[in-house]
Structures are given as structure tokens and as C-alpha cells.
């Protein structure tokens, strides 16, 4: 939502960043243990120089900051998300997040990932629609969350649709278990009308079927002629078959 009162600055000025560092330092100094994002000042400044800092403005005041980095062409990692203490709990965080998501979508990104820091922010991220990252066998903090930014394939049954099934085990174990996730896909000459995007392990079993006939099955990383084509930033991403 961009208005005179509220908007994001995707190319903030150094003065914007300095303004934010002032209240981040004040917040850090009030904390008995000295916790706070001011301790990440070097990260903030480096990200600003790289063009990876976005500021939220309210009535021309810099009251919010996102620091991010690009994992690859589909995923954005949010390193810092913070709102001025005086403006928390008033809806500004949600406005900021949704505006930034729109910006990321415009840049072609498909998903965001972050670590809930502080832990008290977990409730906010759940409210924003993010999901706790499934255990994919990689080292991730238990408070890692992700959010999908685009419309994806249906998990609700569609008559005559092809089906993609994903197990959270390797192929040799999949014979004895049911798939953990199922998507019903529609495609136009091999390109999915809506893609599939989901956290995964590259060794998990993937099956593509039509009317009960298995068209292809195997590990995600070897599912296409080009190894790891469907595995991006520890996500399964299918836009064509």
C-alpha cells in the first residue's frame, strides 16, 4: 500500500539508514542483555551499500527496515525485519511486509525464507501466512519459516488432472509409505498453469502420473535430463514437465 502517509523506499538514502540506526541503538541500550538489531549494524550497512535494504516510511519518518539477500532467482532470504518500537502492534509491520512482497514478486522471486528473531516475532510471521519449514534433512533452525509469493498448483483433487506426488523419503523407502504431499496439475504443452513450489530434500522421491499410470518416478535431483533442475535453494520448483 503506497500512500503519502505510508510507503516503502526500495532505494533508501544514507540518512534513512542513520535515522533507523538511532532508534535501533536506543532499543539495544534499553535491553538489560544488550540484545537488538543494532548489534547487526555492519550487516545493515553492507546490505545498504549492496542495495539490499528497504525502508518503511510513515509520515516521512523511517519506522521500518528489511535487510535481505538473494539466494537465487526464486528465493529471498530476509535477514532483518524490524519496526520502530513505538509503532509495533499497530498494523505497520503487516503493511510493510505486504508491500515488500509485492516488490519481490515484481522482481521475479517466488518465495521468502527467514529465521524468527526474536522468538516473539513467530506469532507475527504466522499471521502473515508463513509456514514453519518442514524438516528436510538439512541444517536449519527450528524457527525457520517460509512464505510462497505466487499462486501454486492445487492440492485439492481436480478431475482428469495429472498428479505430482512427493514423499519425504528416498525412492527405496517410498514403496512402503504414502506420499506426504500431492498436487493436481494442469499444463499447456508441458508448462504448468500453476507451478509447484515446496521445501524438499533433493533425494526425496517424486512421482508424476496420469489417470493412475506412472509417467515418471525417481529422486528429485535426477528427475529431469538436467541434474538438479527441479531443486532450487532447497525447494522443489516445477514450472514445466
Describe the residue ranges of each PLM region.
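Short amphipathic alpha-helix that is part of the acyltransferase structural core
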Residues: 1-39, 157-184
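Short alpha-helical
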Residues: 15, 19, 62, 73, ...
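Conserved beta-strand in the GNAT
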Residues: 55, 61-69, 75-82
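Conserved acetyl-CoA-binding loop-helix of GNAT-fold acetyltransferases
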Residues: 83, 89-102
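Conserved GNAT acetyl-CoA-binding A-motif
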Residues: 104-117
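C-terminal "cap" of GNAT-fold acetyltransferases
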Residues: 117-118, 138-187, 209, 214-241
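Conserved active-site alpha-helix within GNAT-family acetyltransferase domains
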Residues: 117-138
Amino acid at each position: 500500500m503506497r500512500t503519502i502517509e505510508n510507503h516503502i523506499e526500495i532505494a533508501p538514502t544514507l540518512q534513512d539508514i542513520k535515522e533507523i540506526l538511532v532508534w535501533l541503538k536506543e532499543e539495544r541500550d534499553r535491553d538489560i542483555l544488550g540484545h537488538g538489531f543494532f548489534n547487526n549494524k555492519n550487516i545493515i550497512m553492507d546490505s545498504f551499500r549492496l542495495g539490499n535494504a528497504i525502508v518503511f516510511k510513515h509520515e516521512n519518518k523511517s519506522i521500518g527496515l528489511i535487510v535481505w539477500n538473494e539466494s537465487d532467482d526464486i528465493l529471498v532470504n530476509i535477514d532483518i525485519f524490524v519496526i520502530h518500537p513505538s509503532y509495533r502492534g499497530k498494523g505497520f509491520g503487516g503493511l510493510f511486509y505486504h508491500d515488500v512482497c509485492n516488490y519481490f514478486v515484481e522482481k521475479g522471486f517466488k518465495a521468502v525464507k527467514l529465521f524468527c528473531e526474536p522468538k516473539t516475532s513467530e506469532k507475527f510471521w504466522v499471521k502473515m501466512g508463513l509456514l514453519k519449514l518442514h524438516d528436510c534433512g538439512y541444517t536449519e533452525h527450528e524457527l525457520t519459516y517460509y512464505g510462497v509469493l505466487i499462486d501454486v498448483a492445487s492440492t485439492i483433487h481436480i478431475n482428469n488432472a495429472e498428479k505430482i506426488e512427493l514423499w519425504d523419503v528416498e525412492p527405496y523407502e517410498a514403496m512402503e509409505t504414502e506420499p506426504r504431499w500431492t498436487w493436481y496439475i494442469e499444463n499447456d504443452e508441458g508448462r504448468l498453469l500453476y507451478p509447484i513450489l515446496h521445501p524438499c530434500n533433493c533425494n526425496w522421491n517424486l512421482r508424476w502420473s496420469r489417470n493412475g499410470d506412472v509417467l515418471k518416478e525417481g529422486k528429485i535431483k535426477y528427475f529431469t535430463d538436467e541434474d538438479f533442475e527441479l531443486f532450487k535453494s532447497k525447494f522443489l520448483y516445477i514450472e514445466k514437465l
